[in-house]
């Protein structure tokens, strides 16, 4: 035990510190969409390597932190990440060397506020270094910190956030099974139709329930519309071009749940991504935009009515981005009306930005 303790800790002037950052490396890798993204390695004073890669979205909010791209159209159609990778090597690596890997807040603040330092009206925006460079390093540091404290990553993150660590609730996966919006070449404006196996007794059982329902849905789509209906969209959900609207989609999902034998165990979540079909000139939402039509143009109140009707008819427990990213007023109205029954999520609205979160709370 003593040798292990000596390996894990370093004593400096009577205080015990954990492993420190010896080197940070980064590289360009390819994500699930075939686009470049950033992967970072944090190498500690113990010689251990901790790795993390960052995701990116097909439809992103205008207030999200800057994802630094090369904009060289001759390479990856402008989506290369070599600038972000270089920033890890030349800016982050020398500045973070020697810092205790458990000093997550200190490291994050140093990257965002000191090394990058760029701000917009909503706060720190990471335009110099790039959010993709900063996040890759931050995630890798978190893994190093968890290892240094000999804790599972989820426990370590809860500790950093000041949350209770004596009890944990197993998260319920939200499984994207039908794609629309910017994720699929069909007429559906709602971007993600997800299932949540809330009746499962373990995470592994939840994944099994989700998988079985997904495959029953595949069989159902093929039998109703033919093989082309089982083509998948940007995030792995089916992008069946034959499906006309959200009601037909939800009926298919309910039938797949019933056929899989999991009725009563599954709730439904929607990621509407409403900014994608919002018209800023009229202040209205066009649910027939992808068809090039205007027969389903709605006000925010009418759209709220639609959500309320769907939540009454189907077991919908979560709705993400139901309105445009600047439509705070509609979020307020919908929360008052449906908030006790449905979880209302602001992704493009809040973009994990402290100032926007504060505005949302107020």
What are the roles of these predicted feature ranges?
Residues 19-62:
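Structured beta-strand/loop patches that form or line metal/cofactor-binding pockets in enzymes
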Residues 31-32, 122-141, 173-185, 232-233:
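Glycine/serine-rich anion-binding loops at beta->alpha junctions
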Residues 1-20:
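N-terminal mitochondrial targeting presequence
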